[in-house]
Amino acid sequence: MKDLFLFSSLLDASHTFSYFFHIGLVALIAVIVAMMATRSMQLVPRGMQNLGEAFLEGVLSMGRDTMGSEKGARKYLPLVATLGIIVFFSNIIGIIPGFHSPTASLNLTLSLAIIVFVYYHFEGIRAQGFVKYFAHFMGPIKLLAPLMFPIEIVSHLSRVVSLSFRLFGNIKGDDLFLMVILALVPYIAPLPAYVLLTFMAFLQAFIFMILTYVYLAGATVVEEGH
């Protein structure tokens, strides 16, 4: 990213400042959008309220399909929707010249993945109890428990790697792709690339949200006979 101009470099050229500058900018944009959507609530939604309600209803529908219940979907809606908003705006801001995607840094993606990892284990223990929750890690066959338990531990730890590196790799790749396109064919020619990158920003936010719901469902939904 050395050859790419960033507005943040006008204040401080360091990578650390750029990272926190864009994180703060994403948070500010999210707050402004939320305020615009809730500023004058109406029975028949219009404008930003309509967009906000459509987004939340979409996330809630995803949660119902994943969790298997309206109650579970609504319980975790604030977390999942907030993660989706942060990931989406962090992705999309990088396609604007002069700005950089915070999700192109492993610092943010790993932090978000750890939040999901810690929270779904916390919810699983709270829903099932400490002993019963970790008993699931040993599998239904007691003789195989010494083998299954470490495999399950590695499997859960790999979710942190999967969540963080998938998002980081895709957005970092998108940034590099855009930089190459702009260098080779500037002006009007990169417009199709912008459409593709906008779609990818939506897609990565969607994947992060649905995986969060999947992990929460796996931790909190008690299976019969297991």
Swiss-Prot record:
Which GO molecular function annotations are given, in alphabetical order? Answer: proton-transporting ATP synthase activity, rotational mechanism
Topology with respect to the bilayer: Multi-pass membrane protein
The residue stretches assigned to a coiled coil in this entry are none
For this protein, the record's InterPro entries field holds: ATP_syn_F0_a_bact/chloroplast (IPR045082), ATP_synth_F0_asu (IPR000568), ATP_synth_F0_asu_AS (IPR023011), F0_ATP_A_sf (IPR035908)
Question: Where in the cell does this protein reside?
Answer: Cell inner membrane
Question: Where do the TM regions start and end?
Answer: 17-37, 79-99, 105-125, 134-154, 176-196, 199-219
Q: According to its UniProt entry, what is the function of this protein? A: Key component of the proton channel; it plays a direct role in the translocation of protons across the membrane.
Family statement: Belongs to the ATPase A chain family.
**The name this protein goes by in its record:** ATP synthase subunit a
Taxonomic lineage is: Bacteria, Pseudomonadati, Campylobacterota, Epsilonproteobacteria, Campylobacterales
Q: Which gene encodes it?
A: atpB
